[in-house]
């Protein structure tokens, strides 16, 4: 798997874990979040946890005290598994997740993030602290987008696979006149002045939008488009800040303005952005659709079909929508050995878990229920098979189509099966 797509897969897995953690609520302040930065001394963390354990023995509520002490014990046990802090640091989330009052179900999530952690934090609260990890999901690299014509302008950003509309401007530049002589020349001067003022206003708005990103090192380039020569006049004039002018990657002919114009600008600038993820995603989804429509046998979709293709090493690129939320559930009776394996949504799982209270074969209530994320399982299978993985966003038309028409799971194949 290429470095880029592996990182995408790691971020996708992180996003799913964050979503799971954010749903959990403690009955008291009993959920522990622990962030250990890369390179930090684990013995110091253990010392802090022992001090917290001593303090927690003074908690007045018997239930909360029991749950906090249990969570701290579990965290300390887990840290003993590490000789040193993992390369990118470590985030631990521990606490009682039982929904039944009085019951204890201490669970632990250990996350080695895809990027170095630079935060050291210990927090005991009713919710887990996920903001430092969420910051890793925020796409930093951005491209400035400007569409310009005589009477209208749009300013936007391409950030990851999302096109954001930041600003829309209109002008009072009058149209051309048929009058002759001095009236025409005076009218033309007024028109030129109005155009100049409008261009200045576009530049000011663009400077406000893009300079902060440039200062943070997030602005990778600017693309400018429009239907006529106005865009070239804007580029050649002294309207944009000189540091932003250095970031102009290209000027493109487009027909539309507004939000649709921004989308057209990105589409028409595909050569400039050929390595950008939104262009790569569009090409991959269109390639997948082409194989499906032409029935070439080099595309498949649906969990069972994709799983089989991965098992025999037939997958070239695994496509997973960020909206895909299926889980795999295995229920086993520890008395008679009956077993059931099903795939369902998270919502269906909540209903299923409450309904299956005893074995349908022998009636025993001694059941073991396992649940795991289908997407994470398939990504690991793809890695083992040497397949690429592409996470398809819901921010493009192609991504929406892939999710709605194919359930958000498909594959481009190396060979027919």
UniProtKB/Swiss-Prot annotation:
GO terms for cellular component: cytoplasm. InterPro entries: eFR1_2_sf, eRF1_1_Pelota, eRF1_1_sf, eRF1_2, eRF1_3, Peptide_chain-rel_aRF1, Peptide_chain-rel_eRF1/aRF1, Ribosomal_eL30-like_sf. It is found in: Cytoplasm. GO terms for molecular function: translation release factor activity, codon specific. Directs the termination of nascent peptide synthesis (translation) in response to the termination codons UAA, UAG and UGA. Belongs to the eukaryotic release factor 1 family. Heterodimer of two subunits, one of which binds GTP. This is Peptide chain release factor subunit 1. It comes from Pyrococcus horikoshii (strain ATCC 700860 / DSM 12428 / JCM 9974 / NBRC 100139 / OT-3).
